[in-house]
Amino acid sequence: MLSSTFVRTKAGRSKPVRLTAVIAAALFLAGCPSQAPQTPPANIQDEASASSDYYLQQLQQSSNDNKADWQLLAIRALLREGKLPQASEQLNQLPKNLSSVQQVESQLLTAELQVANKSYVSARSTLGHIDSGSLSANQLVRFYQAQIAVNQGKASLPLIRAYIAQEPLLTGKAHQNNLDQTWQSLLQLTPQDMNSLVINANENVLQGWLDLLRVYQDNKQDPDLLKAGIKDWQNRYPQNPAAKTLPTQLNQVLHFTQASTSKIALLLPLNGQAKVFADAIQKGFEAAKNGVTPSTPVQQQQPASVPEQAAQPASTDPNANGAVSTSAPDAAPVTAAQPSAPSTAPITPPQAANAQIKVYDTSSQPLAALLTQAQQDGATLVVGPLLKENVDQLASSTTTLNVLALNQPETPKDNPNICYFALSPEDEARDAARHIWEQQKRQPLLLIPRGAFGDRVAKAFNQEWQKLGGQTVLQQGIGSASELRQMVNSGGIRMSGTPISTAPAPQAVTIAGLTIPAPPSDTPATSGGSVDSVYIVATQSQLTLIKPMIDMATNSRSKPAMYASSRSYQAGAGPDFRLEMEGLQFSDIPLLAGANPQLLQQASSQFRNDYSLVRLYAMGMDAWTLSNHFAEMRQLPGFQVSGTTGVLTAAPGCVINRKLPWLQYRQGTVVPVS
């Protein structure tokens, strides 16, 4: 018989407690299994949110049956963490006897690794061997994201189909992003792309998206018609995911409101070296306000004939003041062939001729004080400032006024009330990059002035080239005309250069919501290679020496296509020069390319044939047009205006892009590039 023990209570009495129950409880607890936390089983078809260290540790501790699963999860984590060499090593060490589920995951990881390494051709091939029907929902998201990544943002039917297939698998912000990216891809389709599309009869969602794009393209120049068109489309395609949740940009269209231009504050430097440029802009602004448009004749106020060599006013390079880019002073215009009509019809500005305009002098007061004064004066829109140092201050401004700046900072910030319109060499270089790319050239060489001016041009060209999908851009600095003459006697120009070092860093890749950092670049760029195109930023006197040297340095088979900026286009060039330039293409604003000869005649006479000031006069005209379409530029993606300085569209951040006409010297004449 078990003995009893006595426990003394607070009251002082002893209470017997049987040991039987205590011992029984102890024996029961001793027999219970351990309650230590259990490692959840590896599920390669689900999320893999833990660190690679955790999965690698489980790999070491697991039995042979689970090792491959943990290894696959570790590879996925290594990819997410940007540890691409380690991921590749683990992928190569996978056992050969994988199950069918493991083999599919291995293929998907291989494709994701190839995407991360930018081996897009290999990734596309790997993805083509994966049966999407065998994938889980989580794997499908990754599968379609990899398909999207291999297209590198280039609009195509496979890219759009991948977005559409991915959409039902997403929720919340990821779902909205999917709709926005689908829409952006559709907007990138060219008319040629649209005409060549072949879709299946059962692709109802794709058909709905394409019809929405047609509605947008047909009505984007009229906000009211566009609103009605979108609502009608929603009624016709009620089951389309975009009908239930519009892309962000189209949702903004439904809430579009026109901006007031009843009182405009024009901020310009009225004193100092930049005054001559400000005067030209102001005259163009007022001319457009009074009814002069790029496409309508003007009343001649000057003699019809212009002396071939008029005296030139002393003109300071506006770039020195951070203003705008122009070419050197020019002589009388040559007769150029009429360029082909732009695809965008000219926009008639709203009836704002009665708008009140007040000019404020940025050379006399700080920008912040002028903005405050303009607001107190009742201004509803600000046009300007012009000088770059003033434009740089806009980012820190607290003004709520709509501002059309006449220049742009190095890195424009996206402010909801600011647009940037610059007649800059960088803007022209970006247009040149797009033009050369459209002509199927892929290995450009830039011949640019040495120094800060040339560096800015090279950086702008290269950044646009990378956006288009281009690779290395070479640059070579050029000196004065006298230096170039010496080069003629010492072997001429070499068709090589140094890679531009301002290329953007490799971008990270996002797969299934996980951002994989870009791998470090360890491939040295080359300075030679086959150059197929040359973009020349030079004066006419420099170009007279450069082109013949290129012709002599290359044979007819390897001769690169040659392009020049407006800097080289000066009026009054004789037939010998035009014959020497045979085949060379160059860009300039529509006004100087022959879009309105009567307006050009008047402007040239007014500024004594100084094309630098004629360009600024044209800029002032377009500033008036943009002022009257400020809200459209800010809120309607794809909205276009055909102006005197180019076809104007708004890029992200409301940076106004200009598409310029391109001309070519052919048999002693100047004709549009076909």
Curated annotation (Swiss-Prot):
Disulphide connectivity of cysteines: none
Chain residue ranges for the region called Disordered: 291-349
Pfam families per record: LppC (PF04348)
Compartments where located: Cell outer membrane
Sequence intervals crossing the membrane: none
GO cellular component: periplasmic side of cell outer membrane
Chief localization: membrane
Domain of life: Bacteria
GO MF terms held by the record: enzyme regulator activity
Positions with biased composition (Low complexity): 292-315, 331-349
Lipidation, S-diacylglycerol cysteine type: C32
GO biological process per UniProt: peptidoglycan biosynthetic process; regulation of cell shape
Oligomer status and interactors: Interacts with PBP1a.
Function description: Regulator of peptidoglycan synthesis that is essential for the function of penicillin-binding protein 1A (PBP1a).
Protein's name in the database: Penicillin-binding protein activator LpoA
Annotated organism of origin: Serratia proteamaculans (strain 568)
